[in-house]
Design a protein with these regions (language model features):
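Conserved acidic
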Residues: 1-262
Length: 262
C-alpha cells in the first residue's frame, strides 16, 4: 500500500523496441512506464536478477529486466551499459482509490480491536496487485458436485493421469521418482475441482504482469532508498518490506515513519 497509494502503473502497451539507446529510454520514461532488458554494470546490489529460481541482487556486469523506478535509478547512476529491448506503456494511478478506501478501514478495525476484519482488509490491500501476475494452476478435473460442502485440501494425482496434460517430467516429484504429483482439491458453490501447480503454467485470466512487476519494483526501490539513508553498513537484515537496524540509526528514518500514515 505504501507505493500503491501514489504510484503510477502500466496501462496500455504503446511500443516494443528490440534495441535502443539510453537517451531513447529516458524519453520513454518521461512519458510513462517502461520495462527493459538491460546490461547492468554496477558495484551496488540495487538491481534484481532471477537466478536458478531465486531472486538475487548481484554486483558486476549482468543482464536483467528492470521496471520504471529501477531503470530511472540505473540511468541516473550511469549503470546501464546496454539496452537490449524495451516495452513502453501509458501510465495511470491504478491503485490509489483502492488504498484510499481500504487503508482507513483497516485502521478503523484495528482501533476497534476487530482482528478478523483487520486481517481480512490487510489481505485485500496486500494481495490485489499480485493477481495481475498470477499463474493459473493446471486444471486436472472440474465438474458439478452440488452435494459436496465447501472445502479445500491437499491431495495427490497419479502420473499416468497427467502424462497427456503437462510436462510431468519437469516436476520435483518426478525427480524424486515418485509415482504421483502433489495437487489441491476444492469445492465451492456446487463445483468440484482438482488443480496442480506445475511447470509451464499459463498466466491467469485478466493478468498483466507489468503491473505486478512495477509494484514490487517500486517497493524494492523504496526499501533501497531507506537502506542508503541508514547506510548499507548499518543494515543487519532486509526482507520484502522491512529492515532490521540498530536503534541508534532509527533517527535517520524518522521523516519516513508514522504510526498510521503511509
Amino acid at each position: 500500500p505504501a507505493v500503491m497509494a501514489n504510484g503510477v502503473y502500466p496501462v496500455k502497451l504503446t511500443s516494443w523496441k528490440r534495441t535502443g539507446a539510453a537517451a531513447a529510454l529516458e524519453q520513454r520514461l518521461a512519458a510513462g512506464c517502461v520495462m527493459a532488458e538491460v546490461v547492468i554494470r554496477t558495484s551496488s546490489p540495487a538491481y534484481p536478477l532471477r537466478h536458478n529460481g531465486k531472486l538475487c541482487f548481484p554486483t558486476g556486469e549482468f543482464t536483467t529486466i528492470l521496471c520504471t523506478d529501477s531503470l530511472k535509478y540505473a540511468l541516473q547512476q550511469g549503470h546501464v551499459h546496454k539496452v537490449n529491448q524495451y516495452l513502453a506503456f501509458t501510465a495511470a494511478p491504478l491503485f490509489s482509490s483502492w488504498v484510499d478506501e481500504f487503508y482507513p478501514l483497516k485502521a478503523r478495525y484495528k482501533a476497534e480491536g476487530n482482528e478478523v476484519w483487520e486481517k481480512a482488509i490487510k489481505l485485500l490491500l496486500n494481495s490485489l496487485y499480485g493477481k495481475f501476475g498470477e499463474k493459473r494452476a493446471l486444471e486436472i478435473f472440474r465438474g458439478p458436485d452440488p452435494e459436496r460442502d465447501f472445502m479445500r485440501a491437499n491431495t495427490i494425482v497419479d502420473i499416468p493421469t497427467l502424462e497427456d496434460k503437462f510436462p510431468w517430467t519437469l516436476t520435483a516429484e518426478f525427480q524424486k521418482q515418485l509415482p504421483y504429483v502433489n495437487a489441491q482439491e476444492w469445492s465451492f458453490l456446487g463445483t468440484y475441482c482438482i488443480t496442480a501447480d506445475v511447470p509451464g503454467r499459463e498466466e491467469g485470466p485478466m493478468s498483466m504482469v507489468p503491473v505486478a512487476a512495477h509494484v514490487t519494483d517500486q517497493a524494492r526501490q523504496l526499501l533501497w532508498r531507506y537502506m542508503l539513508a541508514v547506510g548499507l553498513e548499518n543494515v543487519l537484515y532486509c526482507d520484502t518490506d522491512s529492515l532490521i537496524i540498530e536503534e541508534q540509526h532509527l533517527s535517520r528514518l524518522a521523516a519516513h515513519l508514522h504510526e498510521t500514515e503511509l
